[in-house]
């Protein structure tokens, strides 16, 4: 949404059951976003020539940007693409001490059944009570307990959130997140550079012509 909330997401695939669906049901559909005071101004756009979404929050007390992207880049052997079922939310601190709460409310399997949330030192695991084969894992550089309890967070440096369909083998930290961001950014810049250019609506076409998220 325009305020940085994810209100519809089928996961891990495009035709999978939804895990966030507040666009259809505000009460129980599930969402993943940021809650700030009414003093904040929120603007949203895409990083030029990419499919990376930028949502900027600014007020007198501080400013930060949330960069949303799904990793996408050429594999090391150059025979295909690395396209994991993952969504990064890179929280880039700009100035001051901005405050917000994270609304992490997954509702797997179209919000049917009870949602089970398990918190571990590494992640928050979620799944549906009567269909637990599909699970989601939220990794973060912020306190997982604060996220689960929806406590106010004061941002003083860059942080990240990672929603993954799989448990991560490689430890995830902010430096790893920045590497994934840079790889994805370069991929999109190269992809758009090779694409046909149009006089009108060129940037809009980038966002509706995304390559399929399946390894080639």
Regions flagged by a language model, labelled:
Residues 1-205:
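Terminal accessory carbohydrate-recognition/targeting modules of carbohydrate-active enzymes
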Residues 206-216:
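Single conserved hydrophobic/aromatic residue that forms the stacking wall/gate
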């Amino acid at each position: 949404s325009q305020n940085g909330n994810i209100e519809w997401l089928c996961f891990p695939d495009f035709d999978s059951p939804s895990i966030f669906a507040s666009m259809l049901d505000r009460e129980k559909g599930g969402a993943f976003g940021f809650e700030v005071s009414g003093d904040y101004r929120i603007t949203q756009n895409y990083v030029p020539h990419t499919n990376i979404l930028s949502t900027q929050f600014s007020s007198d007390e501080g400013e930060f940007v949330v960069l949303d992207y799904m990793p996408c880049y050429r594999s090391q052997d150059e025979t295909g693409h690395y396209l994991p079922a993952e969504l990064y939310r890179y929280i880039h601190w700009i100035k001051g001490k901005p405050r917000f709460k994270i609304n992490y409310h997954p509702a797997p399997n179209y919000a049917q059944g009870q949602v089970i949330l398990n918190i571990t030192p590494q992640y928050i695991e979620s799944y549906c009570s009567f269909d637990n084969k599909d699970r989601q894992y939220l990794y973060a550089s912020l306190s997982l307990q604060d996220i689960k309890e929806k406590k106010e967070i004061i941002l003083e440096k860059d942080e990240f959130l990672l929603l993954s369909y799989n448990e991560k083998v490689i430890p995830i930290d902010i430096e790893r997140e920045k590497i994934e961001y840079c790889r994805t950014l370069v991929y999109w810049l190269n992809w758009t550079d090779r694409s046909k250019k149009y006089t009108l609506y060129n940037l809009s076409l980038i966002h509706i012509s995304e390559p399929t998220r399946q390894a080639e």
